[in-house]
Amino acid sequence: MSALKTLAAALLLGGSAMAMAANDGQTRVNELLSSDPQYRETWEGVVKKEERLPEWVMNLSGTPDQQMNAVTEDGDKYLVGPLCESQDKCLNHRLIVAFSFDKKHAYAMLVDVPEGLPADKSPTRHATYRFLGKPDQGMQDLLMETLKKDPNWY
């Protein structure tokens, strides 16, 4: 019977993280803070001690590039997805965000590439990376792997 209770609790916890989806059934980074006060509280804890962050990062108010995905890192589940400053500046200013399913931890990687970079120049060689939320090496790798899934990132 306790296995059944554990399964039910896991389904409720996992389901609540996914329940705040948009009409298309997909969760996007820019919807998280308004979907649940716990997300807002956790994110504010991440950015409050950071200096010189753009407002779109502080408020997660940019343009979502794609839906968020459930990912496991070191046995813990996270909701991970990208956010762009705006649709036309996605290559230049983007944020990869990861929230734990329990909404208690959040990490991010802010990626900036100089605007006006010629098309024949690799963005990876000119990018600067800034990690938020003090992610360990495993989380940094997960955020970087999420970025590398973008076909325009080479």
Regions found by a protein language model. Give the residues of each.
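A short, structured loop/turn motif at beta-sheet edges
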Residues: 71-74, 98-104
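C-terminal partner/receptor-binding element of secreted or periplasmic proteins
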Residues: 23-39, 115-154
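Bacterial N-terminal signal peptides that target proteins for export
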Residues: 1-8
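N-terminal secretory signal peptides
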Residues: 22-80, 151-154
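Short, surface-exposed coil-to-beta transition loops
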Residues: 89-96
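Short consensus segments that form the blades of beta-propeller domains
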Residues: 58, 85-89
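Short beta-strand segments that buttress and anchor functional surface loops
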Residues: 80-86, 110
